[in-house]
Amino acid sequence: MKTIEKSIDISRIREYTVEAGRADTITEDKLIAVRDNGATRISINPQTMQDGVLKAIGRNHTAAQFEECFSLARRLGFDNINTDTIAGLPTDTFEGFKDTVDRLIAMDPESITVHTLTVKRSAELFKSAESFRDGYLTDDSVSRMVNYAYDALTRNDFMPYYLYRQKNTVGNLENVGYAKKGKEGLYNVYIMEEAQNILACGASGSTKLIDRETGKITRYFNYKYPYEYISRYEKMMGYKPELEKFLSGM
């Protein structure tokens, strides 16, 4: 974060989000560093508040640990916190998902993002057709979860402000971000509108540059794997002159 501060005038930034991640990776020292180096918004992601489901999907934290991390962030002064949950997780039920949504609402974050399970092609779940026939992964059951989330969140002043879909999503359903008024994630809106340049750093990063006059979008992709990123770094930097030229004209 110090490197970012040296490279960018963060005093001009309207929103500075840090993906704090899962409860088992968050520490007080990390949150203090995030707070003291200019971040204005963080995301803490339980995915579910059901310990049995967390275990089933290989997560190493518990709902209680998430609650502790959330409370810690509040005590440290964070006043714009997003939480993520996923509808359709293996072994989850409508009642379990309902409990997750209700508990998140009670914790009173500024925004809640409701994702629908997307099964990656490399995942074991994708390879097993039988898994998709289990009751908890039927289109109807997941639709019921998503509909409940909409009703409960809007009833508690969380308004939907952005939506997107991914491939292999259960029921071809969507991911929806809900936020309290004035707490919408600007990055999410601008990205969906294809209205924001992205400067990506590190392995698997994707830079996107938008020409304001022509609307042309140019993308540059970093190598995915760290060993490849390191060994082919010079070749990858071949687009740097074009990037610098673009930025100098902004």
Residue spans of the language-model regions?
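Conserved non-cysteine loop/helix-boundary elements of the Radical SAM core domain that shape
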Residues: 1-148
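Alpha-helix termini
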Residues: 90, 97, 101, 170, ...
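Short amphipathic alpha-helical surface micro-motifs
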Residues: 1, 69, 96, 169-174, ...
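Radical SAM enzyme core and accessory elements
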Residues: 177-250
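A C-terminal junction/extension of Radical SAM enzymes
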Residues: 122-201
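Histidine- and/or cysteine-centered catalytic micro-motif in compact active-site loops
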Residues: 117, 166, 204
